[in-house]
Amino acid sequence: MSGDPSEEELEELRKKKMEQLKEQQGGEGEGQEAAQQQAEAQKQAVLKQNLTDGARKRLNTVKMSKPQVGEQIEQQVVALARSGRVQGQIDEDQMKELLSELTPDSKSFDIKRR
């Protein structure tokens, strides 16, 4: 009969240990999430400071259609701003130039029917 209480105690200890592990993992995830949110907020602040309204609209349009290209452009603008190579704000024409540099020329295909 002495085995039954020890099994209950073991089960209780297991539950406590599992709860502790879950709390630790949850705490780390929250810390990473908070850091990501802070980094995203800083990136948005830099973009808002260095892009005109037209350039920001164009960037948002690109992000909607091609998210990877939009992220590349954002990273490029942030890098340029942090290195001090941006004079004034980037307008829509400069944004078009950045887009044309980072996106390869689209290939056209001619389909001929016989």
From Swiss-Prot:
One Pfam entry name: dsDNA_bind
Statement: the UniProt record of this protein carries the keyword DNA-binding: yes
Compositional bias annotation for Low complexity: 32-45
InterPro entries according to UniProt: DNA_bind_arc (IPR022889), PDCD5-like (IPR002836), PDCD5-like_sf (IPR036883)
Biased composition (Basic and acidic residues): 12-22
Keyword DNA repair: no
Start-end of Acidic residues biased regions: 1-11
Keywords: DNA-binding
Region (Disordered), start-end ranges: 1-45
One Gene Ontology CC term in the entry: cytosol
GO terms, molecular function: DNA binding
Matching PANTHER family: PROGRAMMED CELL DEATH PROTEIN 5 (PTHR10840:SF0)
HAMAP family: dsDNA_bind (MF_00026)
Matches recorded under NCBIfam families: PRK04239.1 (NF003268)
Family designation: Belongs to the PDCD5 family.
Name of the protein this chain belongs to: DNA-binding protein rrnAC3180
Organism for this UniProt entry: Haloarcula marismortui (strain ATCC 43049 / DSM 3752 / JCM 8966 / VKM B-1809) (Halobacterium marismortui)
